[in-house]
Amino acid sequence: MHEKVYRGIVASPGIVIGRAYLLDRRKIVIAGRRIEEVNIKDEVARFKQSIDLSKTQLEELKKRFSKGMGKSHLYILDTHIMLLEDKMLIDGTVKRIKESRLNAEGALKETIAAIGLKFDTIEDEYLRERKRDVEQVGERILRNLVGHKQESLSDIKEEAVIIAHDIAPTDTLMMRKDKILGFATDAGSRTSHTAILARSLGLPAAVGLENITEAVKTGDVVILDGIHGVVIVDPDEETFLDYLKKQRRYKYFEQELEKLKTLSAETLDGHVIKLQGNIELPEEVASVAEHGGVGIGLYRTEFLFLNRQTLPTEEEHYNAYRLVAEKASPYEVVIRTLDVGGDKIGFPGIFEKEANPALGLRAIRFCLQKPDIFRTQLRGILRATVHGNIKILYPMISGLPELYETKRVLEEVKKELRSEGKAFNEHVEIGMMIEIPSAAMISDLLAAEVNFFSVGTNDLIQYTLAIDRQNEHVAYMYEPLDPAVLRLLQRVSDAAHQARITLAMCGEMAGDPIYAAILLGMGFQNLSMNVASIPWVKKVVRSVRMQDAVELASLVMRQPTASLARKTAENFIEERFPDLVAEL
């Protein structure tokens, strides 16, 4: 039998070879049915009992795992527990039971689908992927409704590579590392909580393979290449031996990376770079430190708004930000203000549906049109500044008028707090995202108004190249090293250094080791990324001289195409540390 190769998405790096275990995680197929009015009360009670049972199960899991792995990975369970208390989920299902006379299963499925639609149009991939958390919680409730017990991964006795349609974060927590070598799934993305948890636990994984469950049966020999998102089924002898060598080399390299965690990200000639983490929840702060990061370069605040029917209060804002500031102290925490549109945060009817939300009323535009929402968040952030080193980051600023207006609102909020006798840091630093080409083009003007720039490459690349990277027909054109993108980045860097303000990056580009030396050479001082990328980028930083990085950036900038720029970067990396290239 010839080997078969399946390509998906890199979720968590690593190479494992073993026998497959096909896990049944297909969704329960249950048709909704109408019920009689006399049964409505009982159906609502049945649904609420299932909610309570689901909550009990997750609380027990949390208690069980808190002893062995500490608190840094348990925030995902907290997220699922919070979803079980979500008003949109509970009230939406109860309403459908009462008004549409649907059974609990049918009402729940309709509610989950309706909530999912809100997430589908969110531009931010990380936030959009939270839809999977809602679906996974819904699946748990549904299984409890019908009394369908799920096969537990903790029961697996032999070493295996798990193959499944999808895997919930709770499944990942139950994976015993002495038995579960890694996993591959049909569904999923790099930003799913399952993928994030796999990286945090050091469990190799590939997701988004589409039909891997149809190609593999339990007992098949498989190679899981989590570095490239590849699964090889029934490998031939040459491939098998080649991957054994790669596996040994990777394990050695991992041990070398582990040694770097407590060391600073310092070039060979003494230039120190801040490597920081992107987070969503307070519980993720510990993981940043565990991976050798120094603070939070991007704290997404949208979680406070999503999946609810009431706006977060000032106290909710304050408590969330205070907790992160205290956990991260003495390092800095960069808090990004709300970065989605009004139609995505659970308050229908605020605005009409937009034909093109990516270019519509979102982020700072939304905040300036809804000043009450914006001011409440700013009050919470400012009050939290007394608890740590907090900085404020404004997203999607396109020009000076927006920036002037945000500064005016902030000054008004400061004045309010002073009059109320509420403490805050009067000198809190203010920064703005550079993620729109217009902002990059006038970055010299904008730099005079802020303390720092943070470049959001995900949107900047999409807007510059007019590409939707979720569109499979044009996604191949999404290229960070496109000459147009590089010239904008250099323009922003020149403006920041001329104004003597800090230059940071918090997009995916910041966490790619291939780009690290280029960004150093372009003058970036802070790089914020997914925590699992920190050791890899630190390896590059500690292996290069700043002079060489500047030379590389200049060389890459002179290339006429993205492919030539990439080849130039790869050659540079390979010449200086081939052991790293072998693992990329």
List the model feature ranges, each with a label.
Residues 1-327, 333-340, 370, 374-378, ...:
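Non-catalytic, soluble scaffold/interaction modules
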